[in-house]
Amino acid sequence: MTPAAVVMSNYGEEEIVRPIADFSPSLWGDRFHSFSLDNQIAGKYAQEIETLKEQSRIILSASSRRTLAEKLDLIDIVERLGIAYHFEKQIDDMLDQFYKADPNFEAHEYNDLQTLSVQFRLLRQHGYNISPKLFIRFQDAKGKFKESLCNDIKGLLNLYEASHVRTHGEDILEEALAFSTAHLESAAPHLKSPLSKQVTHALEQSLHKSIPRVETRYFISIYEEEEQKNDVLLQFAKLDFNLLQMLHKQELSEVSRWWKDLDFVTTLPYARDRAVECYFWTMGVYAEPQYSQARVMLAKTIAMISIVDDTFDAYGIVKELEIYTDAIQRWDISQIDRLPDYMKISYKALLDLYNDYEMELSKDGRSDVVHYAKERMKEIVRNYFVEAKWFIEGYMPPVSEYLSNALATSTYYLLTTTSYLGMKSANKQDFEWLAKNPKILEANVTLCRVIDDIATYEVEKGRGQIATGIECYMRDYGVSTEKAMEKFQEMAETAWKDVNEGILRPTPVSTEILTRILNLARIIDVTYKHNQDGYTHPEKVLKPHIIALLVDSIEI
């Protein structure tokens, strides 16, 4: 909530003082509004990709001549290059075969730190509940990791990456993280490229907690420097990246035109203009071509909830917001006449958007699932209103009361539900499961909430906001800002463990459904890096990623 400022406005017969928003303008202008697909280049890429895809399939299949370490390395490379979605079943079958052939990891090859670490991480990421006690073989009699490992940089790097898939009570992985981090930080300045770049990058952003598409773009450039690279896989990855980027640019152009036609920048100047950042967010949830419709729908929803959020946070007064909240609960265009003129604009746009969703999904007989997204929208608006009243009344709730309300205003209940709308594979049972707030969803929402609270604390404090999570915790427990932030960081770590646990088999829904939740968690780790709010202030955090993924293509 922004502080009150002298912006006079009439409401009935009385003059009111509104807040002033201080959001920076869009970084992008009209850059993405139009995109003309070069069909000749796209066709050429697609043709080459089909040939390379078949060659890559053969490379994956020709495993009998490779050692276990080479097979695992190959799968890891294919996944990091962003082309694994072409070979999902083949990769799943390979990993299943490795696991069933040696479920206790007794082969001598597993005495190699890199091999065991890669296998452990890959199996965990694919849902296998593998015990981390396997790493005991690398510890001494005192239960500490052997100092002799400190010279095995690739082994340490993969141990570090493996430690990020940890769940609750896995102390050995906590020790693995501390041990590998310390030795990698010490070694990094003395390494040669590309290994030095990989170590520095990993310490900045772990693979498991990063946005897959961001990691793909980075890894393609790193893999090109490798002496032992596979040229077929590299060329396939480059072409696939560029072809998929063309689709992403088309989608962003559609979202940008929709946003421009709404003209909120002119009619609702108090709100954030972040359509491009909204689309980037969706690429983190799913980048693959089959999710094109889903990305566009999710991007529009994020942009719309941003407008609603800013209406509560940066412009509206309580009596207006009360009517606005009630109108959204009723979800009927006839309610529009009750609203102030500026609210009519966003109210109509909101209802129109969901009507569009229903029409679009009716083509596949799925219009009924829009109901679940509407209910999440109503929920978040109710909770926004509670926060607005707290601010106006100067009320600081107990931290438990704060969190029970603020989990919804993190937007992640809404965004997770919306992420399934455009997924043809998401059925009513999946939406019902999600509506019951399963543990993995609760963890994801908590993660978003507490990391956002840490990142935005200083800014909100400067605006006069007292009902922040950090302030509430400090007041309740009589601790310093630093201690409160440490506690929230602990809550985030606990939430990550719940997310990691939630993707392990057996699962109540498909891996495809669960991956959206995992990816939403990953977006938080990237967007709020170093406690910065990358969405509100995208200049430092998101701008380089957006340029890498949506502006610059890869040189072929």
Curated annotation (Swiss-Prot):
Intrachain S-S bonds: none
Motif stretch (DDXXD motif): 309-313
Catalysed reactions, semicolon-separated: (2E,6E)-farnesyl diphosphate = (-)-vetispiradiene + diphosphate
Cofactor note as given: Binds 3 Mg(2+) ions per subunit.
Binding residues for Mg(2+) 2: 309, 313
Binding of Mg(2+) 3, residues: 452, 456, 460
Top enzyme category: lyase
Record flagged with keyword Magnesium: yes
One GO BP annotation of this record: diterpenoid biosynthetic process
GO MF term list: magnesium ion binding; vetispiradiene synthase activity
Cellular location(s): Cytoplasm
Induction: By infection with P.infestans.
Keywords (A to Z) from UniProt: Cytoplasm, Lyase, Magnesium, Metal-binding
KW Lyase (keyword) present: yes
InterPro entries: Isoprenoid_synthase_dom_sf (IPR008949), Terpene_cyclase-like_1_C (IPR034741), Terpene_cyclase_plant_C1 (IPR044814), Terpene_synth_N (IPR001906), Terpene_synth_N_sf (IPR036965), Terpene_synthase-like (IPR050148), Terpene_synthase_metal-bd (IPR005630), Terpenoid_cyclase/PrenylTrfase (IPR008930)
A GO cellular component entry from the record: cytoplasm
Protein name (Swiss-Prot/TrEMBL): Vetispiradiene synthase 1
Organism, scientific name: Solanum tuberosum
Organism taxonomic ancestry: Eukaryota, Viridiplantae, Streptophyta, Embryophyta, Tracheophyta
Gene that encodes the chain: PVS1
